[in-house]
Amino acid sequence: MPVNTSNCSFGWKAREFKLKSIDEKIYTLQDLKGLKGTVIVFICNHCPYVKAIADRLAFESRELTKIGISTIAIMSNDVENYPEDSFENMKNFSRLHNFQFPYLYDELQTVAKDYDAVCTPDFFGFNKLLKLQYRGRIDSGVMNSHEENEIKRELYEAMKLISETNQGPIKQNNSIGCSIKWKK
């Protein structure tokens, strides 16, 4: 059953974290934040909603990098019950979709809880002060849409505005996805 994200809590301060990346290194938020803003997105490998946007996420991330915005992906699912989301499969998923951003493993699920993440994908767009300005979706595309010219680039446009003004758009469309798979 699909889950929607909650509305943006403008000004909420990003929580620090220290997580292992698929490159086997440990990173903190301070290591990875962007000069003009940061996107943190909770994703996984098995969810059809994530699979549908993975290539668009890779593209938008490359475009955001050009304007000083970094992207950080975090996988917080229970890998014991969802082995497709394992650390090794995270590496494979990243390669398959040509991710050029850090893909971090939240093994203890503390970061997902700290951020009140509810689904995959769940996007958090922060300004350069690491204050939340966007909690929306990647774009207006439907799950199987591949016609780029018909899609409104909501994440990109919001982060572009944030990079220029430190403020996110008032109107935001919630992301939809699979629920985070919590450990029991």
Describe each region flagged by the PLM.
Residues M1-S163, G168-Q172, S179:
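Chalcogenol-based redox active-site neighborhoods
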Residues W182-K184:
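Core SAM-dependent methyltransferase catalytic element
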